[in-house]
């Protein structure tokens, strides 16, 4: 059988079956359409302006490794004029983060980008290992998720950047759309397909890989020989998310466009005005100054529970009542430093390329 | 004395959560022992029937009057006739039963059950059921039950028309008898000129093709995935019902979608890119073109069982002794999005009974993000603009696409020196193209391919027949160059033209 020619350029020999479209295309065209689609995502949403300082949330996994590579390349190819940084969060999970942080440090060298690693220990006084030893394996993802989001914003504030880009891919977003519908989480459903989110006092966050399939990111890393660490978190994976992920993978196998079709669906609707009116207004945490839906932000609530030896108080209402019954938080309680949005120069020294 | 072993972990001895809350007594009357458990609540047989019929009426009655105001129960007056869609499945059979018993005097469950018939008319003499003469009519004329036989699409499938007819006619033998008009349709009617002449205006002459059944099979076999065959079938059934309803001057079409099926449809629709019309899945209003070409009065498609789960439907059918004919449930095999979603949702419903209701309630809070600028020719639901630009931006398939060259992109490195541009099949001009007139989901249905090899396609059919309403509407679509907004009145769609119109969608040429 004669080799297939690329469905896009009609010249070179087709090398891959593109996961997103099922088309058989050559390697060069694969690189080019992958990169151009990310570029389209960036330009369509007017994500950046020349001179922006942008931090790439880097975990050392496939998504952020490819993101760092592609961001650097697009920045040069299309002259975005961005100043790029790498920002990593060290959750303090022995054996999980150590190797991937090495990848990030190597990326720092390869891409010639300044790197900042911010640890949970440094920010909250607790590592995830210490948290798990107190709360057990159940519910520890709640702590990690809440702490990571705030840590990224705080790290970005320290770097004095305008913008954080994360490696969330199309599969992640499609899965979140489905999960939010099944959980009835209207507030998140309304914003989960936005390419860029920005709280009043926080730094802009965007997802340039919003339309990039996970399989294509892996394929890109493979052909470009980008090395990354693929380690599952050693603490329990979220069971409900697991269900949705398996379902999504089945849908993708049935019809590969399903992932992007779900994202299109998520972008096509919004929450009705009358429902929006009932949603809570954003406020500022009284204790740490970070954006919050309540008087205390979730991170401060969780941290107070940990510090007072009642870790579940941030998770169940019953434990919260028990904590409240014991009186107000003591004055000497360890708290998160007050959040200062970026202003002027970097607040901390960053590791520059040696 | 207890022989419990104190060293055993207490948690390990904990009984599983009972399937019902607290007591075995009915939560409603608090007297009788319960017979069924619905989402952890116990109901006795006597309380179960009013529970379901109340939910049924609550879902239906607010949309009966053209404007939902005034005391509803006294003044239920629809602007047209009623058409009930019956598939032979559980939901629609239960719905037909509820319609007959609630509005058309079929013996109520209380009469059928152990209890003696009430001395006073149930619901008071003002209740529509107990009124007589002209006053009793909520809908004009005789209500119709419409069944669409789909066996033509799936060789080897059983023709159930006669068995469904018996179900409908069984209401004529009850006391008091009530006869519905039974309208049996076939899926291939969508390609049958004779049927179309009865419901729509013939503005064009379709290509002299083979029989309707061959046209249907050619249409379905041209689709690229199992998923597409399932959703195309659903669309054909929906439009056949709607055009039939319009021809009978119906104001309401009732479908027996249960809460479970609604959740499946919502998730499956979203997974196929139909997020823009998510609100239409629960409740929609449609206006077609009548025989003389003008828009018909709006027809409301109501799903009165949208608050009743599949389990409650099954209990209703069992206690009322309903005969369920069954339906040809083609969900696209094990590899169709329809069947994957159905398995997923019914599995979730088993473990987390509230999930289906959460999905439906969440989707009821959604609305399309922007206004619609037209209607999809195929499914006739509102279509979003800019769909093709979105698709070409997020999934590049060609360097020749207008949006690619106009955005100032460089050529890919390996083509930078090439003098000739890649040769692609010539695209027909946009005005003659079907693509701009399709919604995202229908375009995806016609074009999105499977990763596991395509559905077997017929090699001899060069022209894919389309449902007749598509051809009729296409002939009325103004061209993009036609700035005066003039509309083509009559135009013959030849073979070549039809081919050009859908050239981009044909997959069997490759």
Swiss-Prot record, chain A:
Write the Enzyme Commission number(s) for this entry: 2.7.7.-
The alphabetical list of record keywords is: Cytoplasm, RNA-binding, Transferase, tRNA processing, tRNA-binding
Q: Where in the cell is it found?
A: Cytoplasm
What InterPro entries does its record include?
Answer: CTU1-like_ATP-bd, CTU1_C, Ncs6/Tuc1/Ctu1, Rossmann-like_a/b/a_fold, TilS/TtcA_N, tRNA_thiolation_TtcA_Ctu1
Q: What is the superkingdom listed in this entry's lineage?
A: Eukaryota
Name its GO BP terms in alphabetical order. Answer: protein urmylation; tRNA thio-modification; tRNA wobble position uridine thiolation; tRNA wobble uridine modification
**Which Pfam family name is an example for this entry?**
ATP_bind_3
A GO-annotated cellular component: cytosol
Q: In which pathway does it act?
A: tRNA modification; 5-methoxycarbonylmethyl-2-thiouridine-tRNA biosynthesis
Q: Name one GO molecular function term.
A: tRNA binding
NCBIfam families cross-referenced by the UniProt entry? TIGR00269 family protein
What's its job?
Answer: Plays a central role in 2-thiolation of mcm(5)S(2)U at tRNA wobble positions of tRNA(Lys), tRNA(Glu) and tRNA(Gln). Directly binds tRNAs and probably acts by catalyzing adenylation of tRNAs, an intermediate required for 2-thiolation. It is unclear whether it acts as a sulfurtransferase that transfers sulfur from thiocarboxylated URM1 onto the uridine of tRNAs at wobble position. Prior mcm(5) tRNA modification by the elongator complex is required for 2-thiolation. May also be involved in protein urmylation.
UniProt similarity note: Belongs to the TtcA family. CTU1/NCS6/ATPBD3 subfamily.
- Which HAMAP family does this UniProt record tie to the protein? CTU1 (MF_03053)
Q: What is this protein called?
A: Cytoplasmic tRNA 2-thiolation protein 1
Species of provenance: Laccaria bicolor (strain S238N-H82 / ATCC MYA-4686) (Bicoloured deceiver)
GN (gene name)? NCS6
């Amino acid at each position: 059988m004669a080799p297939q020619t690329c469905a896009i350029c009609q010249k070179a020999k087709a090398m891959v079956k593109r996961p997103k479209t099922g088309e058989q295309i050559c390697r060069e065209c694969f690189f080019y359409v992958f990169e151009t689609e990310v570029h389209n995502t960036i330009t369509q949403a007017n994500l950046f302006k020349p001179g922006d300082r942008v931090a790439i949330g880097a975990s050392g996994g496939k998504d952020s490794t490819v993101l760092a590579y592609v961001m650097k390349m697009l920045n040069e190819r299309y002259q975005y004029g961005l100043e790029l940084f790498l920002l990593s969060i060290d959750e303090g999970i022995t054996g999980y983060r150590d190797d991937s942080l090495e990848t990030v440090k190597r990326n720092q060298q390869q891409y010639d980008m300044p790197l900042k690693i911010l640890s949970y220990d440094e920010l909250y006084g607790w590592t995830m290992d210490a948290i798990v030893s107190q709360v057990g394996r159940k519910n520890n993802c709640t702590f990690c998720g809440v702490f990571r989001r705030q840590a990224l914003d705080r790290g970005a504030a320290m770097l004095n950047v305008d913008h954080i880009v994360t490696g969330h891919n199309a599969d992640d977003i499609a899965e979140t759309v489905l999960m939010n519908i099944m959980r009835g989480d209207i507030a998140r459903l309304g914003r989960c397909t936005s390419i860029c989110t920005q709280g009043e006092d926080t730094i802009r966050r965007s997802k340039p890989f919003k339309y990039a399939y996970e399989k294509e990111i892996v394929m890109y890393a493979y052909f470009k020989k980008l090395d990354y660490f693929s380690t599952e978190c050693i603490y329990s994976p979220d069971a409900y998310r697991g269900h949705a992920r398996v379902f999504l993978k089945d849908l993708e196998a049935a019809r590969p466009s399903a992932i992007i079709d779900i994202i299109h669906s998520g972008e096509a609707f919004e929450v009705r005005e009358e429902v929006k009116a009932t949603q809570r207004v954003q406020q500022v945490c009284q204790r740490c100054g970070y954006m919050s839906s309540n008087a205390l932000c979730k991170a401060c609530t969780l941290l107070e529970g940990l510090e007072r030896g009642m870790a579940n108080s941030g998770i169940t209402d019953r434990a919260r009542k028990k904590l409240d019954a014991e009186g107000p938080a003591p004055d000497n309680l360890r708290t998160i430093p007050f959040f200062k949005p970026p202003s002027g120069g970097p607040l901390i020294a960053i590791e520059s390329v040696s | 004395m207890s022989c419990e072993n104190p060293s055993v972990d207490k948690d390990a001895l904990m009984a599983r959560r009972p399937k019902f809350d607290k007591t075995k007594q009915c939560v409603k009357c608090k007297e009788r022992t319960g017979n069924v458990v619905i989402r952890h609540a116990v109901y006795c047989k006597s309380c179960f029937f009013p529970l379901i019929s109340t939910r049924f009426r609550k879902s239906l009655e607010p949309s009966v009057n053209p404007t939902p105001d005034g005391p509803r129960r006294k003044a239920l007056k629809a602007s047209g006739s009623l058409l009930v869609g019956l598939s032979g499945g559980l939901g629609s059979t239960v719905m037909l039963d509820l319609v007959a018993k609630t509005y058309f005097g079929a013996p109520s469950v209380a009469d059928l059950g152990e209890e003696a018939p009430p001395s006073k008319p149930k619901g008071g003499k003002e209740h529509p059921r107990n009124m007589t003469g002209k006053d009793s009519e909520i809908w004009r004329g005789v209500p119709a039950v419409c069944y669409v036989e789909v066996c033509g699409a799936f060789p080897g499938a059983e023709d159930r028309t006669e068995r469904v007819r018996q179900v409908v006619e069984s209401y004529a033998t009850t006391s008091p008898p009530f006869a519905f008009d039974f309208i049996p349709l076939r899926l291939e009617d969508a390609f049958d000129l004779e049927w179309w002449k009865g419901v729509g205006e013939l503005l064009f002459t379709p290509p002299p093709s083979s029989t309707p059944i061959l046209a249907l099979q050619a249409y379905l076999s041209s689709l690229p995935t199992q998923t597409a065959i399932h959703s195309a079938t659903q669309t054909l059934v929906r439009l056949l019902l709607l055009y039939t309803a319009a021809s009978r001057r119906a104001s309401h079409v009732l479908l027996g979608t249960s809460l479970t099926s609604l959740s499946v449809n919502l998730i499956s629709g979203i997974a196929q890119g139909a997020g823009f019309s998510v609100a239409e899945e629960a409740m929609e209003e449609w206006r077609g073109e009548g025989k003389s070409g003008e828009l018909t009065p709006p027809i409301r498609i109501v799903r009165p069982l949208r608050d009743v789960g599949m389990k409650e439907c099954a209990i209703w059918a069992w206690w009322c002794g309903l005969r369920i004919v069954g339906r040809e449930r083609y969900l696209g095999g094990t590899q169709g999005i329809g069947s994957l979603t159905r398995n997923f949702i019914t599995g979730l419903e088993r473990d987390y009974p509230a999930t289906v209701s959460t999905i439906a309630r969440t989707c009821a809070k959604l609305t399309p993000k922007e206004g619609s600028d037209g209607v999809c020719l195929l499914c006739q639901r509102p279509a979003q603009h800019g769909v093709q630009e979105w698709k070409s931006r997020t999934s590049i398939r060609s360097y020749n696409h207008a949006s690619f060259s106009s955005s100032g992109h460089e050529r890919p490195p390996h083509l930078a020196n090439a003098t000739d541009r890649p040769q692609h099949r010539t695209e027909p001009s946009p005005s003659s193209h079907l693509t701009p007139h399709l919604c995202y989901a229908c375009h995806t249905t016609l074009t999105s391919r499977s990763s596991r090899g395509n559905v077997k396609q017929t090699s001899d059919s060069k022209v894919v027949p389309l449902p007749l309403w598509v051809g009729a509407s296409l002939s009325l679509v103004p061209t993009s160059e036609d700035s005066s907004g003039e509309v083509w009145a009559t135009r013959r769609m030849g073979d070549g033209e039809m081919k050009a119109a859908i050239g981009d969608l044909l997959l069997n040429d490759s």
